[in-house]
């Protein structure tokens, strides 16, 4: 193995050693969401024609799990290394900033997709959701995990203590996730909130992902693809720049 592959393997091993916490726990949480929201809101929330609310909810929960866990992987790894003071050992290696980025974001994609697959496997029994366009599912799943993995890397570099990381997650990631259409179609919202939703990049990730299941979406999947791709490019550029300049990692 070369340098980036070793770091990638280390990051995979890091979350896999506590797999019950990092993989199984989010799956259990998604089951609870499905049981509670699917039961309470079935028939009460307007979604797509001929699509039950429980079936509509499933892709949203899968993508929400992918995004949140991809972010948690890179952000928690970096903040733990900074707080414990062992990040210096990585800095002593000849790894380039690109190798760091690929390893951290790549491992975040693996964790996000693993959790998403687990949520899909378990919750699919609640509603036999079709797979109209599997390629769209894979594309948006991968891009969403990479985007949040990159965002987690930026947050991990910025935060200097766990409180700052918790604030970033509680005031940025969680609100944007819950207001992205996981539990509802934006067409059920008043016009003003529909317009606000279009400024949320998480909405396009979830809407494009959901298109792969039903073949219908609130906006064109091609528009979602372009916007998510643009957001991924911006986040990647910022993350690479911060790593290259040693932002908050070099004394």
Language model features: what each stretch is:
Residues 1-135, 139-251:
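Hydrophobic transmembrane alpha-helices and immediately adjacent juxtamembrane helices
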């Amino acid at each position: 193995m070369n340098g980036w592959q070793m770091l990638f393997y280390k990051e995979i091993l890091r979350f896999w050693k506590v797999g019950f916490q990092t993989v199984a726990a989010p799956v259990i949480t998604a089951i609870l969401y499905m049981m509670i929201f699917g039961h309470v809101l079935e028939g009460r929330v307007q979604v797509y024609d001929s699509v039950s609310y429980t079936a509509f909810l499933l892709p949203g929960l899968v993508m929400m799990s992918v995004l949140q866990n991809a972010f948690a992987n890179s952000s928690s790894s970096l903040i733990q290394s900074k707080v414990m003071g062992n990040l210096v050992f990585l800095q002593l290696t000849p790894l380039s900033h690109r190798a760091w980025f690929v390893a951290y974001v790549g491992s975040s994609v693996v964790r996000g997709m693993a959790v998403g697959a687990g949520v899909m496997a378990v919750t699919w029994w609640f509603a036999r959701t079709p797979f109209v366009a599997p390629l769209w599912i894979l594309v948006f799943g991968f891009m969403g995990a990479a985007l949040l993995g990159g965002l987690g890397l930026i947050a991990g570099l910025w935060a200097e203590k766990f409180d700052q990381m918790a604030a970033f997650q509680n005031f940025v990631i969680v609100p944007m996730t819950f207001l992205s259409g996981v539990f509802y179609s934006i067409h059920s919202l008043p016009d003003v909130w529909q317009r606000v939703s279009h400024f949320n990049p998480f909405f396009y990730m979830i809407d494009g992902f959901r298109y792969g299941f039903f073949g219908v979406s609130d906006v064109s999947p091609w528009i979602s693809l372009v916007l998510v791709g643009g957001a991924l490019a911006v986040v990647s550029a910022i993350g690479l720049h911060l790593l290259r300049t040693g932002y908050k990692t070099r004394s």
